[in-house]
């Protein structure tokens, strides 16, 4: 919808998507480095990916610390705000791709409960997160996929109208 009002390049679209998924991928970097360096088995990556709170695989303290702080920093509105200000002054054309990161933070704040990886959006001031609805609850997943299908159909219909 934004592209109907502002010209967005394919590079910007790619940047939006990349920055939308980056916060959840970034925390794997220390684990990948540790595994690649021979410190742990490859299975740790899978175990970490499917872990529930309290059931994460045992990692060396430095790896655990880096994973934790990368997760917090990547999900922080304060960190994203500081980066956005820097980008605004140094590379304003990169502001559109930052929408991906901001959308990730906003969605995570409301789709993570206190019991299931709360999103620390005010890090480094506090680790507390908003007690939202856990994204893995059945009712949320059903609602989510129904809304995605409805939006996809709406975009398909409006795109056909614009094209003709």
Feature-to-residue mapping (PLM):
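N-terminal membrane-targeting hydrophobic helices
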Residues: 1-164
